């Protein structure tokens, strides 16, 4: 029997967007165990408990890490794309190197995964390995004056995702079916996005398996605890003036709800658990450490801690504001206000990590009859389409020439009284014209290709 007590928000745990007084950007708390729980019989001595892989820096192979209940010799059989297999042996708890003569890399355009069969004593499991690297570096062949970009397997990629909060109208944080996880990813891919930003929630691993299979990049947020440091109205001033505040003094910790050492330790334990859980998935290319200063503290130290846990992925250390100068990006949020160029003095890749949020309530597909929350409201689909075309063509796309290397449109679907989704909350209606969104995203990629990036 499994029992869980999860008081929100008074339990001191990381709670995400759940609230006991929902409204605006805070949503109804989900009661009970909302994720996957299962039991399975395992051999007493030889049980394999975890398999993960890590791509070699030169992309000519990967290491397999196997954990087992007891020290054991491990055999790894790898199916090759051209047919046949290769087999290697090693010890549980140690890296087992797999060399590949003609590696087929995982990428959004070719999300190939190697099939693994791993055995130790009486136990045998199947797994996958996506061979890919991600880093920040110069755009190959571009003018040296261009800002650096995200390189997937050495090729410059513009990371273009919507914000994905993972809520459903009848079940809250729990997807109604496995197909619902795949549906959202497919719907966004069909609109021209190449990934999603999984916002303040760690999904079931089924979600990441679908993203691996579909070639959708995932920006994964760390689940927040503590408290927001500013109100919504204050955040508008912060966006307009680009105000920055520290996060190490006692007063900063108090404002962020992090005065309790136990609360901070819980956050860091959960951070390590998230990295451990999602490490096997090639789709996850970036971690978001803090969002809009919610519970933000000691960002520079925690960025170092996160890199020690996972040196293979990128980090958006402070998404939105209160940038401490670290991380892999200059990351900003911009709602309602006109999009602006990043300053020349900050040469980090510019990541517009939230923007858009255009609202359209669809009769018969909204949460309830109460007031709507959002940033820019429209009365009909034509007005929404016109606004999106103007936003992309006159503001977003021109930023590529000035260092834009990633962007996150808010958002995949409506959530409760927030009506700014590309889809309605029930996922029954695509609100903007699908062909228009596909065209706008194609123009965005074309602008990036014009400076040397991958189309």
Regions found by a protein language model. Give the residues of each.
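Substrate-binding/catalytic cleft of secreted carbohydrate-active enzymes
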Residues: 186-187, 195-440, 447-454
């Amino acid at each position: 029997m499994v029992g869980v007590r999860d008081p929100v928000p008074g339990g001191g745990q990381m709670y995400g967007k759940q609230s006991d007084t929902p409204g605006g950007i805070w949503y109804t708390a989900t009661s009970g165990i909302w994720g996957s729980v299962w039991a399975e019989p395992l051999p007493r001595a030889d049980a394999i408990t975890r398999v993960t892989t890590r791509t070699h820096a030169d992309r000519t192979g990967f290491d397999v890490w196997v954990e087992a209940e007891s020290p054991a010799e491990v055999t790894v059989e790898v199916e090759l794309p051209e047919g046949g297999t290769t087999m290697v042996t090693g010890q549980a708890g140690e890296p087992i190197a797999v060399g590949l003569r003609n590696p087929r890399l995982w990428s959004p355009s070719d999300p190939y995964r190697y099939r693994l069969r791993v055995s130790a004593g009486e136990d045998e499991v199947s797994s996958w390995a996506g061979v890919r690297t991600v880093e920040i570096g110069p755009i190959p062949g571009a003018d040296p004056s261009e800002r650096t970009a995200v390189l997937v397997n050495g090729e410059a990629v513009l990371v273009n995702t919507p914000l994905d909060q993972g809520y459903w109208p009848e079940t809250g944080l729990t997807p109604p079916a496995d197909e619902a996880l795949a549906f959202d990813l497919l719907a966004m891919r069909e609109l021209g996005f190449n990934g999603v930003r999984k916002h303040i929630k760690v999904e079931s691993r089924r979600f990441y398996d679908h993203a691996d299979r579909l070639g959708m990049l995932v920006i994964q947020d760390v689940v927040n605890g503590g408290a927001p440091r500013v109100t919504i109205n204050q955040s508008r001033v912060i966006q307009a003036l680009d105000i920055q505040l520290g996060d190490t003094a006692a007063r900063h910790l108090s404002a962020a709800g992090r005065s309790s050492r136990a609360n901070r330790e819980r956050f860091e334990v959960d951070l390590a658990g998230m990295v451990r859980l999602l490490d096997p998935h090639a789709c996850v290319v970036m971690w978001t450490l803090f969002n809009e200063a919610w519970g933000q503290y000691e960002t520079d130290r925690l960025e170092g801690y996160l890199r020690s846990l996972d040196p293979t992925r990128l980090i958006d250390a402070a998404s939105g504001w209160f940038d401490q100068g670290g991380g892999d990006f200059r990351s900003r949020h911009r709602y309602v206000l006109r999009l602006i160029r990043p300053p020349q003095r900050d040469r980090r890749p510019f990541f517009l990590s939230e923007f858009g949020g255009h609202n359209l309530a669809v009769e018969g597909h909204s949460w309830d009859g109460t007031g709507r929350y959002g940033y820019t409201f429209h009365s009909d689909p034509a007005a929404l389409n016109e606004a999106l075309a103007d936003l992309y063509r006159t503001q977003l796309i021109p930023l590529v020439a000035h260092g834009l290397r990633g962007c996150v449109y808010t958002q995949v679907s409506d959530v409760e009284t927030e009506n700014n989704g590309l889809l309605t909350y029930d996922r029954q209606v695509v609100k903007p014209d699908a062909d228009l969104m596909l065209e706008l995203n194609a123009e965005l990629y074309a602008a990036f290709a014009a400076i040397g990036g991958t189309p």
